[in-house]
Amino acid sequence: MSGRIFRGAGACVQGKARHHAGQHRGEETVQEQTLDIATKDGVMETFICHPERGGPYPVVFLLMDAPGIREELRDMARRLGTVGYYVLLPNLYYRAGRDTIYGPDVLQHGSAEHARMRAVRTKMTIPPVMEDIGAMLRFVDGQAAAKPGPVGAHGYCMSGPYALAAAARYPDRVAAAASFYGTWLVNNEAEESPHRSFDRVKGELYIACAEHDDLAPLPMVEELRGLFERAGSPGQVELYPTVHHGFAFPQRWCYDKPAAERHWERLIALYRRRLG
């Protein structure tokens, strides 16, 4: 199927289909492409992968962290693709320019790349991202390889709140949402803080927090847990002991393999329960 053109509503091909073999027994070879998805504000380049054969497959949105799209995230999308999901990894920074990416020192405070990323990141509020989620929902509804019906969404760092917000904004479509070391999930000064919408969620939520995280300090985690329980939200808030913000990223200094593998186990189990 190399070179096959996918054309859905509002989409155009940006490259030939490629294939990526699964790394473990029972995993599928995935087909991958980068497509443009039409949004209210332009076109959003989106990495898409799914098993090469069979289908249709349940849909999952993998929402990027602040440093943006990179091969590390594509590999994470591929891992989900090899176990049977139709995965979309959108460049949420598309409003700042096509193929907006940052150099290796993007996480170094005081660097030019960090400043450039922050200038874009601070404009990434929940409402426009929810419009992007809506655009992706419309797109997958026109794709033969994408299973109709409920979808999943998960995010890391800045996108943890986006995934939870998506479950509240689209409660009849987003059946599972997960946040991994999501930032400021409780912000009492922000009207759009994710904790305010727990009661609108119909799907299952999973919220994983790192013990050492300046962007989600322990008092906030405890407050979040209490709010979550009082709202009667289906799901779980889990604290990962000893690890730091970013623990699931293999190329990050704080990568912790046992915690990262637990995050995969929790995420895939969530999607199996809710999406199949």
Regions found by a protein language model. Give the residues of each.
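N-terminal cap/leader regions of alpha/beta-hydrolase-fold enzymes
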Residues: I5-V13, H19-G276
